A protein has these predicted regions:
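Short acidic DE-rich linear segments
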Residues: 2-4, 37, 55-60
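Amphipathic alpha-helical coiled-coil segments
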Residues: 17-24, 42-60
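Conserved short acidic donor-positioning loop in nucleotide-sugar-dependent glycosyltransferases
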Residues: 30
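Short, charge/polar-rich alpha-helical segments
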Residues: 1-15
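Short, charged, amphipathic alpha-helical segments
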Residues: 7-11, 33-45
Length: 60
């Protein structure tokens, strides 16, 4: 991956993260606690991916 690809992947992941947060808010509002837990786990995975990508970006 070159620097531009890493930057694009970070931007794309940030958009997905924001969308996922909105989905969690909707699930909480509608009382779907079980689905909220799964969605929060996906957020944690996204956070880990962001850490890895930011580390790669720092290496450039």
């Amino acid at each position: 991956m070159d620097k531009q690809e890493v930057e694009f992947a970070i931007a794309e992941l940030k958009m997905d993260y924001a969308r996922q947060q909105g989905d969690i808010d909707k699930l909480e509002t509608n009382g779907h606690a079980g689905m909220v837990e799964k969605a929060e786990k996906r957020l944690e995975l996204m956070e880990e991916q962001l850490r890895e990508l930011n580390q790669k970006l720092a290496e450039f």
